[in-house]
Regions:
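Residue-level preference for nonpolar/small residues embedded in alpha-helices
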Residues: 25, 44, 108, 144, ...
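Terminal peptide-recognition signature
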Residues: 52, 125, 164, 214, ...
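Intrinsically disordered, low-complexity segments enriched in small/flexible residues
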Residues: 1-107, 115-118, 271-342
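Conserved catalytic cores of soluble enzyme domains
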Residues: 165-285
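Glycine-rich, charged/polar anion/phosphate-binding loops
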Residues: 109-112, 215
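Charged, alpha-helix-enriched surfaces in structured cytosolic catalytic cores
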Residues: 28, 47-50, 62, 140, ...
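Structured core elements
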Residues: 32, 51, 112-115, 124-126, ...
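Cleft-lining beta-strand/loop regions that shape enzyme active-site pockets
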Residues: 112-191, 198, 338
Length: 342
């Protein structure tokens, strides 16, 4: 019996070249994690909220996907889409680059703004998209943020912005830098009106965005492991000629030094934002206490010094957490003092 044509002929290794080798896996089926280098199925990553199932690394999330994760279905209303682009420095190739990214991403710029509901809480939402020139802040990005915040002030709505950026957009020069002051001024007016602004920092948040709207939130949250800073660690290391502390400019480092109020897992982000927004909604008290006075006085002067010490050391003495549980329905701890402390 002859088996000449029964088995598929294989090519020897020595005859393989870069041109003849073709991927055996269909394009778009697998995604490589930049941290653990594992190849994971794209669908598995999607089902896990774009978190690596092997090492927990957070993949970057596109703006519309973020909206789907955070906003109640069907509630997002986009604002200020299609604002005209400018090229103030007449930078060569800038217009063509913008047009190419618009076609590739389906976005008009590096941020998506609009109104949404988060578990029924009306909110103005802004989401940066790193695919669009690393979400750098140019005139259109600054204008969209400013318009969204000003409208939120008029309609007395809270603002939530998911920041992700490489900083100011160098192709627009001083016009880009002006957006830092412009967005900050709008947020100051929003704050003066007594309204809430929550900033959520994702990987990476750097440059002029860090120096403006990203770090101006009443409450500042971050995703685990996010790089947050003005200049990047490589630039700082080369400038000062010294080794940087372990974890420098990571979200955990900033939380430890008082610049963040909390680090929130992506799977818990919507629930956390919903809880914070609900706490800041104006609501009438569910009930007013009508009972008798429950406090009673004990004269400590009747006790000896040692008896007072024993009372202070009593293991059954209520702690701060005990009082919080008794007095409030919900409590969310905020860490940041913005002074390099807690």
């Amino acid at each position: 019996m002859k088996f000449n044509c029964t088995f598929k002929r294989t090519v020897g290794r020595s005859s393989l070249t870069a041109e003849t080798v073709k991927p055996e896996v269909p394009e778009g089926l697998l995604k490589k994690c930049n941290v653990c280098k594992s190849a994971v199925f794209v669908e598995e990553v999607k089902d896990n909220d774009y978190i690596c199932p092997h090492c927990g690394n957070y993949f970057r999330v596109h703006a519309w996907r973020r909206v789907q994760q955070i906003a109640d279905p069907g509630t997002f209303e986009e604002w200020d889409a299609g604002l005209p682009q400018e090229n103030p420095l007449h930078y060569k190739g800038y217009k063509e680059k913008i047009e190419g990214l618009q076609e590739k991403t389906g976005l008009d710029e590096a941020i998506l703004t609009g109104k949404a509901e988060i578990d029924g809480n009306p909110t103005v939402l802004g989401v940066c998209d790193s695919r669009f020139m690393m979400a750098s802040m140019g005139s259109v990005v600054g204008e969209k943020i400013t318009r969204a915040v000003e409208r939120a002030t008029r309609e007395r709505l809270p603002v939530v912005i998911f920041a992700c950026s490489g900083g100011a957009r160098m192709q627009e020069g001083i016009v880009s830098l002006m957006q830092m002051a412009k967005t900050s001024a709008a947020l100051k007016r929003h704050s003066d009106a007594g309204l809430l602004y929550i900033s959520v920092l994702t990987n990476p948040t750097t440059g002029g965005v860090t120096a403006s709207f990203a770090m101006e939130g009443d409450i500042i949250l971050a995703e685990p492991g996010a790089l947050i800073g003005f200049a990047g660690p490589r630039v700082i290391r080369q400038t000062i000629g010294q080794k940087l502390p372990k974890g420098f400019q990571k979200a955990e480092f900033l939380l430890e030094h008082g610049f963040l109020d909390g680090i929130v897992d992506r799977k818990q982000m919507k629930a956390t934002l919903s809880r914070l927004l609900s706490m800041h909604q104006h609501q009438d008290a569910k009930s007013v206490y009508q009972g008798k006075k429950v406090l009673k006085e004990e004269k400590l002067q009747d006790k000896s010094a040692w008896e007072r010490v024993q009372l202070a050391r009593d293991k059954e003495r209520p702690t701060g957490k005990d009082y919080l549980a008794l007095l409030f329905d919900e409590f969310t701890e905020l860490h940041g003092d913005r002074r390099y402390g807690d």
